[in-house]
Swiss-Prot record:
Family according to the record: Belongs to the VTS1 family.
UniProt key word Coiled coil: no
GO molecular function: mRNA binding; nucleotide binding
Record's compositionally biased regions (Basic and acidic residues): 1-13
Pfam families per UniProt: SAM_2 (PF07647)
The protein's role, per its UniProt record: RNA-binding protein involved in post-transcriptional regulation through transcript degradation.
Gene3D superfamilies membership: Transcription Factor, Ets-1
Protein name: RNA-binding protein VTS1
Native organism taxonomy: Eukaryota, Fungi, Dikarya, Ascomycota, Saccharomycotina
Gene name per UniProt: VTS1
GO annotation (BP), single: nuclear-transcribed mRNA poly(A) tail shortening
Keywords for this protein: Cytoplasm, Nucleotide-binding, Protein transport, RNA-binding, Transport
Oligomer and partners: Monomer. Binds to RNA.
Low complexity bias (residue ranges): 128-140, 189-206, 379-415, 435-469
UniProt cross-references to CDD domains, sorted A to Z: SAM_VTS1_fungal (cd09556)
Amino acid sequence: MLANKFDEMHHPVPDSSMNGNPLCNSSANVGQGNRNSNPIQSRGTGHSSSPIYNNPLRTAHPGAVLLSPQSSSLNIIDTTVGNAMSPTVPSSAASSIFFNDFGLDSSTNLNKSAMNANSNRPMTTIPLSSNSTSQSYTLSFQQENKKTNSNSTLNNVNNGLVTAGSVSNSHNNIFLDSFLSHDNTMQPNNSSNNNNNNNQNANNSLNFNTDVNQLCTWMSMLTANQQSVVMDNIISVLNESTLNYTKMKLDTMFGTTSSSPTSAEAMQNLGQPKESGNQNSNQNNIASPIPSTLDSVFANNSMKYLQSQSTSGSNHFHQAFNSKGSSMNWSSQASNIQNPAYDYLNDYRQRPKSAEPPLSHQTHYQPSNLSISQFKPQNSNGNSSNTNTNRNLNNSNNSNNNSTANNNNIGSNNTKRMNDITNSADVPVTSSFQNLTLNNQNGSTTTSSNNGNSSSGASSNSSMNPKSLTDPKLLNNIPIWLKTLRLHKYSDILNDLSWEKLIYLEDEDLLKRGVLALGARRKLLKAFTIVRDYKNRDLIDNSAYLNIK
């Protein structure tokens, strides 16, 4: 194709028909002064009359005359064809290489300054024909250059193609240059990197502490159920080491009972290095929203708990703690804060009397084969101890029938715990329990004092008071006797029996008579047992036997 173009430039095809084409006429008029043949091919349907080339019908590009010199590419091919192209063409009629043939858009911006500089130079157009295209190509050449060898012409055409390819890739080059320049600007020097890293680390540390404080504040505003849900989700994502640390801290929290020396002394006694404890305390002190609160209490209480464990011969906590290898100094602002709310966890012998549970909040269960002799006395000092013991024993007269022991084996503190157990038992009392009261008598106590203490100590359970149950007036009036037991709705069922017959009824007899409630039957059987025991020991007044039916 390039060879054909080269041949056509040196051997133009004459055309006899101009058909009124302004471009062709202009070229023809200019060419008459120098040559006899017209190099411009007509836009019409005329055939070429060249004796050398027998080319098919060829027409000019319909938009060739519409291209202005400002949009032509005069810098694509910067050469002329020497003496062969002497005619000149006005700059307004000059055309350029069509960009579509070189893969370019007509709107591609070229070097307009060069075009303006060369716009006044004489121009000429040469038709180019090939077997593969039907378009006319117009080439612009500068007149000053006089070199006419074929190699320079081919090189100029190739240079034009290369230039067109380079223009088509201009956008990509601009993009790559901007990308590389952006990368270069994004690389600071080493000193700025170090400063930025230090500032970033400081900001991260501050943000972490702020997040922890906000989390603690948010957790404190949640309800117990919401906190449980949050902890369930947090525990599921924690590491094993963190879970072990949390378990150790919880064990210490609920196993600690009282305050201890400072956290540093506790760390020394545990065999942990003091430096590691201080590091952990400094780290946790920053993240703690309220320092010196529970962490300080738990850290202070750890020493007292370890001392109590060592005196009782238990080394379980030491082994568990040493295996963890963790520090208990969670706060650097530890202080000797007294926390009496946890004193009852230490030992029941040291807890205050106010910590004793009231009788109305007792745990109800049914003991079996419970012996009071299992408890050892701690304060048995003559008559005062016996008086306290008698009062406590009389408080438990109403419920437990399995305890057989001596009063001298019961301490004042332990008997109160015993009363909490025995008062809640729902087992019928037998005569074996009454032997306990008789064995408690000595030189300073009498039966009358026992009865008086019994009546005063049984105010919490007046319905089962033996004194009221064995009162002759109540025994001779069954409806009133049942009313003391709060079972007066069964008066019509049991009113026809005397108290001596009534106390020997069994569970089946009560069920047959219409006492269907299990609790009512048990309560009646318990009262029957107390009255039978008093009758067997002749503790009931003789007036109760006068009005027997």
